[in-house]
Every structure is written in structure tokens, then in C-alpha cells.
Amino acid sequence: MERTDKTKLLNSVFLISLICCVMIRLLPYLALLTENPVLRELILCTVYIVSLLLPAAAGERLIGSEAVSPEKKKLNAPFLWLFIAMGTVTAAAYINYLVILPLEAAGIVGNSQYNPSVSSVYDVLLLILSSAIIPPVTEELFFRGFVLKRLLPIGNRKAIIISAAVFSLFHGNLGQLIYTFAAGVVFGYVYIYTGSIIPCILLHGLNNGYSVIITAINSFFSPEAAGLLSISVDSIFLFGGFLSLFILLLKRRKDESFGALAEYRTDGEYKSFPIIAVIYGAFAVFQIVLTNFS
């Protein structure tokens, strides 16, 4: 069996990710092309899809020989995994908020939270399209279906962590940095465990859709109602997540194979330093500093 050049693999994945990151940064300028909100959203959504899927398709051809696809497997106890996933992401979001809050209070960083507003049902539908449908589908196809899958030859743990870091830095927002990393880890685990991108898309869509619902309630009813719903649902996710994790640990004591991941590591070596990974990280950090720090 041919040994994998893992440095080349890393550089190839990070090069494609860097291209996506640069293309996405052009979106704010494209928004200036028209004042029509519907046309603007359609342009942004189209460019967003192209910016992620076109480089991914090119990457598939570039490193196609290194392909390793996880074996498809049924997701047992789906509600258990649902609460673990949403509980983890919710906990990470609160941690992220607590980390950023003192920095914002001290004036070190600007307001890093993205708070869209809607004034009609039409706006809600556009927000659903631009937040709860297109990003979950395109981002999961790219970050799990391409980045994570292509990194599997270096080992599950490294592949999950690196792909989650790429996913987190891609968003370029301090207000999302920690919880998008946690989400990337969760979605990555689910992808390798099930061998399917569909559960990842559904979880991602649920998370983003929940934010859309909170935004709509905040706009059409009151901030108090939105806050009450947010705290209630977050509490359910957190409690359900901890309870589900406890049940998972009990199941693992009886059956060590429950929830275990198959290993897809291949033989290979790092022949040089993955410089493109450093360039991607530097570009992403520069964007975060430029966007968030006052």
C-alpha cells in the first residue's frame, strides 16, 4: 500500500480552505451591489454556495487518491446523541459568551454578536433560507464532507480537531469562536460514527433554526419573551445533554463498542512542515482581529 504524504494532504486541505475563506470575505462587498433585500440575499446565498462547494469539488480532484470514506452505520439512540450534541454546543456558547463579555465591557473588542432583525414574515423566510438551510447544507458538505473526510488518513482525533478548528476560524468572529469549534467536534464525531453527512446537516440546521426562532420572537413579540424561551430551551438542552452523557457512559461500561469510532488512519509520514496550515491560521486570525477588535 502506498504511504500517505500527510504534509501534502494537510497543505492541500488547508489551501482549499484558504481559498474558501478568501472568497467568503468578498460577501460584504457584494452586498453593496443592490439595495433590494431579496435580490441581495439571493446573490449572497448563491456566492456563498459557490465559495464553498466549487473549491471543495476542485479539492476532490486534487487529492482524490487519498480518499477515505467512513463506513455508513445506523445511529442508535438518536435522541441520546441529539441532546449530547445540542447540550455541548449550548454549553460552549455560554462559555464563549462569558469569555467575550469582560473584553467587550473593557472596550477591548467591539460587539461580536450577530443580531439580525426581522420586520415581516418575508424577512423570516429569507433568514431561514440564509441561516437555517443554505449554511448547514453547504458548510457540512465542505467541512465534514470534504475537510474532515480528507483528513481521516492522519487519524480520527487529529482529523476532528483540525477540521473543527478550520470550521471555527472560518467564521472569523470571537462571538462564535469557542462554540463553533465545539460544534465542529460534535458534527465531526457524528459524521465519522454514522458515515453520513445527513445527521450533521440536520443538527446544524436545528442549531441555526433555533437562532432564527429566537430572532423572530424578539422582533415580533418582545425581547423578554425571546429571553424566556431561550433560557427555557437552553436549560432543556443542558440538562438533557448532561443526562444523556451520563446514560452514554453507563452504556459504554456495559458495551465498549457503543459510540466507538472505527479508525481510518493510514500509514504515512510528515515529510515537511505544513506551511499552508499556518498561512490559513494567520489569515483567519487577522480577519478576527480586524473584525472584532476596536
Residue map of PLM features:
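Interfacial transmembrane-helix boundary/kink motif in multi-pass membrane proteins
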Residues: 2-19, 46, 63-95, 259-284
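Alpha-helical transmembrane spans of integral membrane proteins, capturing the lipid-embedded, hydrophobic core
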Residues: 14-25, 45-53, 81-94, 128, ...
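Alpha-helical transmembrane segments in multi-pass membrane proteins
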Residues: 21-61, 229-240
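Alpha-helical membrane-inserting segments
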Residues: 23-31, 54-59, 88-99, 103, ...
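Transmembrane helix-loop junctions in multipass membrane proteins, especially transporters and channels
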Residues: 29, 33-36, 60-68, 97, ...
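Juxtamembrane helix-loop-helix connectors linking adjacent transmembrane helices
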Residues: 35-40, 67-138, 152, 289-294
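Transmembrane helix-loop-helix hairpins at the membrane interface
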Residues: 124-293
